[in-house]
Amino acid sequence: MKTIINIFIFCLILFVYLHIQYHLKTSNDLEIYEIEEPSKQKFEEICDIRQPTIFQLNNENLVNETNITNILNKYYAFDMKIRNINDIHKKEEETYMSLPLHTLNKLLTDDNSASYFSENNSDFLKETGVAKIFKYNDEFFRPHMVSNCYYDILRGSDKCHTPFRYEINHRNFFMPTQGTMKIKLAPPKSIKYLFPNYDYENFEFSSPINPWNVQPQYLSEFDKVKCLEFDLNVGCTLFIPPYWWYSIIFSENSSLSIMKYRTYMNNLTISPYIFMYALQVQNIRRKSNNVKNIAIESKNVENVENVENNEAQNNKNENENVENNENNIEPYQ
């Protein structure tokens, strides 16, 4: 009996070990595949190669229902999150700020500095019911034994870019729903030249380097990184494997629908990341970006109240002076 238990434990450990090694496997070949309308079986086989792939898949329901024009027309009063690309490594402040969609849209349209983009909008998708649209139309993309599905809508001001970062989910799909955007990819082995920053609070693993306009202090290291750069249009879906670095630069009025998936074994593989995330969210508090604005607004309100009080006091004094003058006037005889 003891022998049987030992064999069972050995088989269980071997099973877990092989699956973890499978999920940690990466490909560093600097090439991208293009596949037109594959079958589900072919689709799974290609994704398992862990190579970036553009699939010519036209999911009209997702494109029509989740493009930013349709979202803006239907849900303009709901809040979406916005982020400043220049503040990605300022740890003392909140990373995201919520704004009503119509206000956010105006900010992105008027942003001439290419600084703002919107992401991490899962709360918005749940409140508006758009998450159900993703759920009803993403069956083809879901891997076997899926445990977690994450959906998002990503957009930015003209020429704004996302941080240079990588994902640890088992599958990551990026589907343009409006406009055109440029993508830059780098293989996992590039990490030693990219000065990675592990932000467990936002569960983001990024580089301080801007791959579209490299800062002088990082130029010597980034010259060793080989990148793929290409355009992505509506009607295509990009698969980015885990641990591949990517950055997206937006064109005017463009938007992306994003679908990310984890499996049970994927969660086990990334459990150290998840554990660090759980610790981080309990131990860190950040200042809100709204604090400064609220303080300014409060100060303005106080100034207005002081002006109104001064005006009221002046009017009162004038009335008293008029009454005194009237009392001092002698009656006409």
Q: PLM features: what roles do these ranges have?
A:
Residues M1-T237, W245-E311, K316-Q333:
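N-terminal accessory scaffold of Fe(II)-dependent oxygenases
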